[in-house]
């Protein structure tokens, strides 16, 4: 069976780490599996895992592939737009530039206060009918050329729409706060009445293919089989919701050896693992950047009697954050489950995968959420007593963030030396390890595939 995994083209590891373990198990069982993600870090990890990564013939994808795969370079850009590849796929440079301009995304103002998947879709380009229509066409073409029997998606609404239009069986892997039955990312407050939404654009395209209208983008993520990450205790949904919980799905290469420096860690002093994810998503500062995680920890922990391991998930460490304090050790990447198990405390940006890593390994956390979806995750960790979070203060632009180092230092000491935090993390770990898992989830996908073939 040919299975295509699609994810939002985000240059970080969050969405990929929930897809790769399942994709690897499906491949091991004899299925042909491919991915679709043009971003730099996902491309690196997908290739390292031995999968093909298919790029739709869409100008924005090709440009993202170039810009997200390398540091911005005018010479490389010029070489690309005059390349044989552009001539072959778009009919030449002028045609490529025309299509790029015609199908450019229309985005709302950047903000760290993202209320829901529907709001996120509006902020990331889906207000433009030409963009959504052309992206959907390109993804439909890719699915057809790959001859996908099943599409497995992690947060790519247009890919879900393309699969529905083609009649492809659709499996979705989502967080509970992405489910249409949820209250979204900011579930502790009522949303304002005037949030941007792409529903008019989506429903116009759906109607042209004879599909039913939707009320919010989240409905596209409700697959023929909907798999919800986590467990009800950490990722609640209304009781009547039709969804299958699959526990923690986390990526770490099999049979990987610990880094050599693991043996140098002193067992008498606490180990703190700081994971920032992508410190800076674009050449300019954006409201969702995670450099605040590193910067605030440097200030708060430089004189603490702890061993700090700092990683960025294959991303570069911004020059302005160096030199690091003497008690810090920097590595671009470490095996996540292995590092979490060796750590006494995690400090991270609130990404769902990072939260799941701590809960699965029973390691308490201090979370510095860099935007609202991550604050949602942080609040769930706090609610089960497995950690605390501190939200950065921001200026009106949302780009300049700050944290009181004394407050962060006190929180780190509290979580590190309060037994109940570690006890609660271990309690949730036992619950989480008893639910779902990669093999069990793969069984469900195979059962679904067989049922659709009858």
Task: Give the role of each language-model region.
Residues 185-193, 282-290, 396-403:
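Short, flexible/disordered intra-domain loops and linkers
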Residues 167-169, 223, 363:
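A short helix->loop->beta-strand "cap" motif at the edges of active sites that frequently abuts
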Residues 1-156, 160-162, 172-180, 309-342, ...:
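Glycosyltransferase specificity loop/lid
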Residues 170-197:
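Conserved nucleotide-diphosphate donor binding/catalytic pocket of glycan-assembly enzymes
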Residues 288-305:
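Short hydrophobic signal-anchor/transmembrane segments that target glycosyltransferases
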Residues 5, 121-127, 143, 197-203, ...:
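Short, basic, glycine/proline-bearing loop/turn elements
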Residues 191-280, 314:
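A nucleotide-sugar donor-handling region in carbohydrate enzymes
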């Amino acid at each position: 069976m040919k299975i295509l995994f699609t994810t939002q083209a985000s240059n970080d590891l969050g969405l990929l780490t929930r897809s790769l373990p399942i994709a690897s198990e499906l491949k091991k069982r004899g299925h042909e599996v491919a991915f679709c993600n043009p971003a730099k870090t996902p491309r690196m990890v997908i290739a390292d895992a031995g999968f093909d990564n298919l790029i739709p013939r869409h100008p924005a994808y090709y440009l993202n592939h170039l810009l997200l795969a390398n540091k911005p370079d005018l010479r490389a850009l010029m070489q690309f737009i005059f390349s044989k590849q552009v001539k072959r796929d778009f009919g030449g440079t002028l045609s490529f530039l025309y299509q790029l301009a015609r199908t450019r995304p229309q985005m709302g103002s950047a903000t760290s206060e993202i209320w829901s998947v529907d709001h996120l879709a509006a902020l990331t380009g889906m207000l433009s009918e030409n963009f959504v229509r052309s992206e959907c066409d390109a993804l439909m073409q890719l699915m057809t050329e790959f001859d996908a029997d099943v599409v497995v998606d992690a947060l790519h609404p247009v890919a879900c729409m393309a699969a529905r239009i083609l009649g492809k069986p659709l499996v979705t892997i989502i967080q509970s706060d992405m489910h249409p039955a949820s209250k979204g990312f900011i579930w502790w407050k009522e949303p304002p009445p005037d949030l941007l939404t792409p529903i008019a654009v989506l429903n116009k395209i759906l109607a042209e293919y004879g599909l039913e209208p939707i009320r919010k983008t989240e409905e596209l993520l409700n697959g023929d089989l909907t798999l919800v990450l986590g467990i009800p205790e950490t990722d609640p949904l209304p009781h009547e919701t039709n969804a299958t919980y699959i526990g923690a799905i986390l990526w770490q290469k099999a049979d990987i050896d610990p880094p050599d420096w693991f043996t140098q860690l002193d067992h008498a002093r606490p180990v703190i693992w700081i994971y920032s994810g992508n410190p800076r998503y674009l050449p300019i500062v954006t409201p969702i950047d995670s450099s605040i995680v590193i910067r605030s920890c440097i200030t708060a922990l430089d004189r603490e009697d702890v061993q700090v391991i700092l990683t960025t998930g294959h991303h570069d460490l911004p020059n302005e954050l160096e030199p690091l304090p003497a008690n810090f050790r920097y590595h671009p990447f470490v095996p996540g489950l292995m590092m979490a198990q060796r750590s006494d405390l995690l400090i991270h940006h609130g990404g769902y995968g990072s939260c799941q890593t701590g809960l699965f390994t029973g390691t308490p956390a201090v979370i510095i959420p860099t935007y609202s979806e991550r604050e949602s995750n942080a609040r769930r960790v706090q609610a089960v007593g497995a950690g605390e979070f501190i939200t950065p203060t921001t200026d009106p632009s949302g780009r300049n963030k700050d944290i009181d180092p004394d407050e962060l230092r006190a929180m780190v000491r509290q979580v590190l030396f309060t037994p109940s935090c570690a006890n609660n993390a271990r309690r949730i770990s036992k619950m989480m390890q008893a639910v779902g898992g990669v093999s069990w989830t793969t069984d469900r996908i195979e059962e679904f595939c067989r049922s659709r073939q009858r």
